Amino acid sequence: VTQLKLGAVLWSQATDWAGFLSSAHRADELGYDSIWTWDHVYAIFGDPDQPIVEGYTALAGLAMGTERADIGLLVGANTFRNPGIVAKSVVTVDHMSGGRAILGLGGAWFGIEHDAFGIDFGSGFGQRLDWLDEATAAIRALLDGETVSSDDGGRYDFRDLKLNPLPVQAHLPIMIGGSGEKKTLRTVAAYADQWNAFGSPEVLSHKDQVLRAHCESVGRDHTRIERTVGGKIVIRDTEAEARRVLEDLMEHNRTPMANIEDDDTFWVGTADEMIERFLAYREVGFDTVLVEMPAPYDPETMEKLVEVVRPGVDAAA
C-alpha cells in the first residue's frame, strides 16, 4: 500500500515574508512531501487588498529556504505569464532547489486581479481552458528538451523556442488543478503527472472515472497520474477548540466566517476525524492530501498531521 503523502499549501495572503518562510522551513523539517503556495496577486479570501506575495519569486525563496520537500504553485495562473517564460522560471527553480520543482498550472479564475493589472481574462472560462491546454502542451515539450513552434490560430506564437539549461529532473512533473469534465480533465489526462481537486470522496470518485475515460481516449496510463485532494485543515483535541482556532485564523485573514460557512473544503476537528476522512479519500484513490494553511500558519495542526494523522492512516491501510 502506498503511504499517505502530505503537502503543505501556505496561503500567500495576510503574511510577511519572514513568517511565510519560517513556516515553510518547519514543514520541510517535519517531513512534508511537498510545499506549495498560491499564484495570486490580490488576496482571494476576505478583503482583496491584504498583503500577498507573488508566486514565482516566492518559489525561488522556498528553493533556497528548504532542503527536501518538492515545491510548486497550487496552481500557477496560466493567464499571468507567457508559457515559455513559465517553463524558464520553473527550470531555474529546479536548479535552485536541486531538482525539487513541480510546475503547477491552471486556467485562472480570479477576475479582480486580472482587472486591476489589465491581464487578458479571455471571453470566459472555456477560452481560458483552451489556453491552458495549449500552454501545457508547449511547456511539457519544452521541459522535455524539444523545440516548440506554435500552430497558426492559437493563443501563443512560439517560434523555434527551446530551453537551455534543461531541468535537473529527467522528468519535471506537471500539476494541473481543477476538475472540469470536458476540458480540464482532458488536459490532465494528456499532460499532468499530478492532479489536484476539491470535493467529497463521492464527487472525486466520479471525477476520477471521467479522468480515466479521458486517459483511455488519449492513450495514457491513468496510474501515472498522482491524485491529490485539497483541504483547509485545523486539528485540536475537540472540534469546538479547532473551530475557535479557525475563527482566529479567518479573523487574521479578514474573512467573515459567514463567507466560509458552506465551504466543505474546510476540515475542522480532531486527529481521529482527519484519519477517517483521509481514509475515505484513499478508498477512491487519492493518496496525497494537500493541506491549505492560512497565515499565520497553525504549527499544532502542521505537527499533528505528520505525527498523528499520517501514521494513523498508514496503520489503518
Language-model-derived ranges and their functions:
Residues 1-317:
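Active-site-adjacent structural elements that line small-molecule/cofactor binding pockets in enzymes
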